[in-house]
Swiss-Prot record:
Region (Disordered): 1-44
Pfam families: Ribosomal_L32p
Keyword Ribonucleoprotein set for record: yes
SUPFAM superfamilies: Zn-binding ribosomal proteins (SSF57829)
Bias (Polar residues) ranges: 25-34
Gene coding for it: rpmF
Entry-linked PANTHER family: 50S RIBOSOMAL PROTEIN L32, LARGE RIBOSOMAL SUBUNIT PROTEIN BL32
Family: Belongs to the bacterial ribosomal protein bL32 family.
Listed name of the protein: Large ribosomal subunit protein bL32
Length: 56
């Protein structure tokens, strides 16, 4: 079994955890409708990069 040989310090624990923070999704504003959407995703209206790609 994996059992530590020496206790890890608070500093080492913090350094390891420094990369664990979650970040929110990056958002963009559509140039056509002004709607906020996730980057590289189609808006709810069906626009992507200012062009209608879903629906008529």
């Amino acid at each position: 079994m994996a059992v530590q040989q020496n206790r890890k310090t608070r500093s080492k624990r913090g350094m390891r955890r420094s990369h664990d923070a979650l970040t929110g999704a990056t958002l963009s504003v559509d140039s056509t409708s002004g709607e906020t959407h996730r980057r590289h995703h189609v808006t709810a209206d069906g626009y992507y990069k200012g062009k209608k790609v879903i629906g008529a």
